[in-house]
A protein has these predicted regions:
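An acidic-aromatic substrate-binding cleft motif
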Residues: 1-22, 27-37, 390
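Short, well-ordered coil/turn segments that N-cap beta-strands
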Residues: 5-9, 34-36, 68-74, 136-141, ...
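The substrate-binding groove and active-site-proximal loops of carbohydrate-active enzymes
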Residues: 8-20, 41-58, 105-124, 149-153, ...
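Conserved, mostly hydrophobic/aromatic
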Residues: 11, 30, 38, 67, ...
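Short, acidic/polar
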Residues: 17-32, 123-129, 247-258, 279, ...
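Aromatic-lined substrate-binding rim segments of carbohydrate-active enzymes
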Residues: 24-32, 39-102, 230-238, 454
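Polysaccharide-binding and catalytic clefts of secreted carbohydrate-active enzymes
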Residues: 100-264, 276-282
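Carbohydrate-binding surfaces of carbohydrate-active enzymes
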Residues: 196-199, 237, 270-659
Length: 659
């Protein structure tokens, strides 16, 4: 083992904000808090390069030295998120242009165009300097590129560089303007183009063609992916440590595409008491992106906030929140931030120690987490979450399509996936990987693709068909296979592939509001659907459930078809939560997949397997008492006690149980 080993517990540290002599005190306090890693330099460009070409890295070397002497590792960041004033003054064209045509001012963050060549060149230079200085330093365990890259104001940059690149990308994709017009169907509203130069950058105030909007979002995503890749290429030539970029729980940027050039997933979140469970969803999504354990690079100790503090967290929240990434396959949890700022835009954000250096009220929880990471470290490092055999598709392209074509009033794709699909599975302890459509299907016995408009995404349709024929069970729908990648409808049927694959025909469809329609199983039990209703006529398929009222009465709501060695289950509507639990548990059991535990819905139980043995990490997520029934006696590495049978779980309790 090396000098610095996971699991890592740390915080973002900004020594450039404070007098140099304060570093010793901060390091002493970090040791007392039990931290073993700090993130440095993500907003420090003006301190690293006070004027163009004049590099001053000595202060950063001294901080890394002092941290290392205290056995605290460093995650080194490239500071490109916050360009210095000399840059934005001299190279004004590097500043982002918003959808109103207004160029950003100095003083924000991520307010620069990711395609601007001058900005990219200057980012490359500071990245190279850092890489050559720290790229083989054993005290640096990894690299973070930039900070929370995302689209400016949700729409991206509208500068001349971006406009040229957008149109050139369309020209390369379609080769001729006639092919673009044909693919998008631009005859609607007389939108036909005679040249690529006529294609506008869509602005939010205009009711634009959905295909144009989807193309613009794909372009903006690709611009940011390429921006990060260019820094990653520099780092990979000079550093030995893993390289990542910290991302938020959003789908406007494709995690799958972003990480093609990276080594580790770095993930930030700030969910609180009411929605901590949603982080289980997101971590089940970031875990399969790469085989290496992910890093939770930012979360709050007690509350987040900029100029206001956004919500008190109850005692125990910091403990449960800190353990979630470790339980779910990560190897690091870092807080934002170490010491609260004394000036600037985020004065009210939670921290580990206050502005004046006094430990916050959660200090004991931080120390408890540190002690737990140490006590269970061998088990954590020697195991991984057990492969679930079950996958659920989540798509950035689906997010884009539903953003501009919500299908239903106020429909929110991510919320529907979390509340209507994932939460019932989580409460039933049916563990799953949440995967991008481009992800391999090997190792999964059941794949659920709800609300997945375009099966062409990531070449899914070919791989999926072969996987089904080879023995996989695919659960499709509702609102799956209803669009092309360009956001248009199939013209020969409501679905592009599904009718042929599944042996069904969709007679007609109804929206899922304002009323719910009943569905009946063969045993006479009635339940209600949600979101959408497709009335299916079985051909070679078998009707498993039929609508029992309304215009769809007598048509199938759920069908099943054998395809090769596998099968397709089509959902014409999304069962409400309790019925979805029953349906998915039944299908999973038929494929040899069973709940991870017998436990109350508020208790997360993650099976772990590996050279260090078998066991579970248990986290209570709702600040309520719960219960867990153990299948065999187990030893809790956190309190050094043996448990068997039914165990009462306390609010926000964590257990690391080795069998």
């Amino acid at each position: 083992m090396g000098r610095f080993n996971p699991p890592y517990l740390g915080a973002a540290y900004y020594p450039e904000v404070w007098p140099p002599e304060q570093v010793d005190e901060d390091v002493r306090l970090m040791v007392g808090a039990g931290l073993n890693v700090a993130r440095l330099a993500e907003f420090a460009w003006s301190s690293l390069e006070p004027s163009e070409g004049r590099l001053e890295l000595g202060w950063l070397r001294r901080v890394v030295d002092k941290l290392g002497e205290a056995r605290i590792a460093t995650i080194m960041c490239t500071p490109s998120c916050t360009p210095p004033a000399w840059l934005t003054e001299k190279y004004t064209e590097a500043l982002v242009v918003d959808h109103r045509g207004i160029r950003a001012q100095h003083g924000s963050r991520r307010h620069v165009c990711p395609l601007n060549p001058v900005y990219r060149g200057l980012c490359g230079r500071i990245t190279l300097e850092l890489a050559e200085t720290f790229g083989r330093d054993e005290r640096v365990i990894g690299w973070q590129i930039d900070n929370e890259v995302r689209l400016w104001e949700g729409w991206g940059c509208y500068c001349a560089h971006c406009m040229r690149a957008f149109r050139e990308g369309l020209r390369q994709q379609f080769r001729s303007i006639d092919k673009l017009n044909e693919a998008w169907g631009t005859n609607v509203w007389s939108q036909t183009y005679q040249s690529f130069d006529q294609i506008p950058a869509p602005r939010p105030a205009v009711c634009h063609h959905p295909s144009l909007l989807a193309a613009w979002m794909r372009f903006q995503n690709g611009s940011l992916v390429d921006y990060v890749r260019r820094q990653a290429d520099i780092l990979h030539r000079h550093v030995t440590q893993p390289v990542g970029t910290d991302m938020m729980p959003i789908l406007e940027i494709s995690y799958e595409q972003m990480h093609r050039s990276l080594d580790v997933v770095q993930y930030n979140h700030y969910d609180g008491v009411d929605n901590l469970w949603r982080q289980v969803f997101w971590m089940d999504y970031v875990r399969p992106v790469m085989k290496t354990p992910f890093w939770n690079t930012e979360t709050s100790t007690c509350w987040n906030g900029g100029t206001s503090a956004n919500g008190y967290r109850e005692p125990g929240f910091c403990r449960a929140n800190s353990w979630l990434p470790i339980a779910l396959g990560g190897e690091a949890n870092l807080y934002w931030l170490w010491r609260a700022h004394w000036s600037g835009q985020e004065l009210m954000h939670g921290c580990v120690v206050s502005t004046c250096g006094r430990p916050m009220h959660i200090a004991d929880e931080v120390r408890e987490v540190s002690a737990g990471f140490s006590a269970a470290g061998d088990f954590i490092n020697g195991t991984r979450p057990a492969a679930p055999g079950f996958a659920v598709h989540l798509s950035s392209l689906a997010w884009t399509h539903f953003k501009f074509q919500p299908v239903l009033p106020e429909f929110d794709y991510v919320n529907a996936m979390q509340e209507n699909v994932y939460r019932p599975m989580m409460e039933a302890h049916l563990r799953a990987d949440i995967v991008d459509p481009a992800a391999p299907l090997d190792g999964y016995r059941v794949v659920f693709s709800p609300l997945l408009p375009a099966l062409d995404e990531g070449g899914l349709q070919d791989r999926l068909q072969k996987w089904i024929e080879g023995g996989g069970t695919w659960i499709a729908g509702p609102l799956t296979d209803i669009r092309t990648i360009e956001g248009t409808k199939p013209v020969c049927a409501p679905f592009k592939y599904l009718e042929d694959w599944a042996g069904v025909s969709c007679r007609y469809e109804l929206p899922g509001a304002p009323r719910a329609f009943g569905v009946e199983w063969p045993d006479g039990r009635v339940w209600h659907g949600s979101v959408w209703y497709a009335g299916l006529e079985p051909g070679t398929a078998e009707a498993r459930a039929v609508y029992e009222d309304g215009p769809l009465k007598g048509l199938a709501a759920v069908t099943e078809t054998r395809v090769g060695a596998g099968r397709i289950v089509v959902l014409g509507t999304l069962p409400q939560p309790e019925e979805l639990k029953r349906l998915l548990l039944g299908i999973a059991a038929e494929e040899g997949i069973y709940p991870a535990a017998e436990a109350s819905p508020n208790v997360l139980v993650v099976p772990r397997k590996g050279p260090a043995g078998n066991g579970f990490i248990v986290v209570e997520t709702q600040n309520e008492k719960g219960r867990l029934t153990l299948p065999a006696p187990a030893y809790n590495l956190l309190d050094c006690r043996a448990y068997s049978g039914q165990v009462e779980i306390q609010p926000y309790q964590v257990m690391v149980l080795r069998q």
